[in-house]
Amino acid sequence: MDASYTGPKLGDGVSPPITMGFIMEVMDYFKQQKILHRKYVIQILLQAKEYFKSVSSLLNLRLPEDTSGKVGHFIVCGDTHGQFYDLCNIFNIGGLPSPDNPYLFNGDFVDRGSVSFETVMLLILFKLQNPLALYMLRGNHETKNMNKIYGFEGEVKHKYDQTVMNLFTAVFNELPLAAVIQDSVFVVHGGLSTDTSAMTLEAISSIQRSREPPESGLMSDLLWSDPQQFPGRLPSKRGVGYSFGPDYTKNFLEKNNLKLLVRSHEVKQEGYVVEHDGKCITIFSAPNYCDQMGNKGAFIKFYENMEPTFTQFDAVPHPNVPPMQYASSMLY
């Protein structure tokens, strides 16, 4: 290792333990716009790939309980899109991730915001430090094609190289696709498939996910679909997935014995929106999205009764690193 590197240091070996002290050092180092040593980045990503490979495509999550049986809470966040300083603010407001204060991040950690590397790396570090403290689901931006166009690949190659980018792609291919909290709330990045015969918890849990999402089918619908206000379905304006009506949400929840659908994937002015007769929530956690939307961010906290409570927040100041700084010239 170059003697000039004075940043946070991990132990030696293939899988050195990641401590909370190391994470706090890294968070502070990133806030100063400094670059974590490549050796550690590779060690961390290799650990992450092995960890995510070992979990199901559908996570079954429980609210934490203390030794007396008292039930705690769960925090669900939406898109963060490389807005690292706003992610740090989420942890200032909601508390750091821990088994007693668990978080679920619902995809789209990267792209558009130009501090995407630091954003996703911080989430991965919390995940590896204690798997019960933080959970990550795949979004449509945790994919090779999107990363090529919307900035993450350009950012990683600017800060590191293609080898590191290839490792991120391998990690993203192993991320789970959906979660059920307390047998009650279904969380997914995009939305529902309108192929109702395929849209079951059993089918989701058996998806062979270690790949780029195909152009159509259940996996891509989960990542890309959006709710619409009127019943029925339409091909999505995005070109992938569908728009699904309240009838699809009601049918899916009833068929699978669930109460609520939580999804992200769309910026909302207040940081969240409740629709489909209260059965579908969109949560979005990147305030003043791309430095221009003026929206609030929000997260959801679920307590024992599993009723959603919302916390809204505004964007915090950040260094002058413009969004889309590393995006593909194909966009211009």
Which residue stretches match the model-derived regions?
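Feature recognizes metal-dependent phosphohydrolase scaffolds
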Residues: 1-332
